[in-house]
Amino acid sequence: MREPGSERVQTWLAAQDAKACAISDWVFTEFSSALSIKLRNGQLAEAHRATALANFTMLATQRFAVLPVERQHFRAAARFADQHALGLRSGDALHLAVCADQGATLCTLDRRMAQAAKALGLMTEVP
């Protein structure tokens, strides 16, 4: 299942140091949700969903540092979401809160999220 920008992201990831990249525990929820939506909409077969989920889980645990999502991240995400002009969805606000807490650079293909991150003073990279 190829998404727009998949090859560009794969090339970018391959060039990164093995443990220099991190994701939060929230990414597991978002990935599972995205696969379930595609399954419900008929864009993905159950067997492909299971394979994609297994591959993602293996990649995520072997290639990335996994950051916990804690109470303070939800509170910070709410403060970010309160800034209505940023146009943040709750999940994106949570990603940004974890990035802000860790002093991490956000890597995303979502231009709106990247703009919001910059407005909040976070470093961003768009592969």
Question: Predicted regions: what is each one?
Answer:
Residues M1-V27, K38-A54, L120:
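Short, well-structured N-terminal submotif of metal-dependent ribonuclease cores
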Residues A18-C21, A65, A100-T105:
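Short active-site oxyanion
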Residues I23-T29, G91-L94:
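Aromatic- and histidine-enriched alpha-helix N-cap/loop-to-helix transition segments
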Residues W26, L53-H84:
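Acidic catalytic patch
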Residues S33-R40, D101:
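Short glycine/serine- and small hydrophobic-enriched flexible loop segments
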Residues M58, L94-L96, A100-P127:
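Acidic, PIN/NYN-like endoribonuclease modules and their adjacent C-terminal/linker elements
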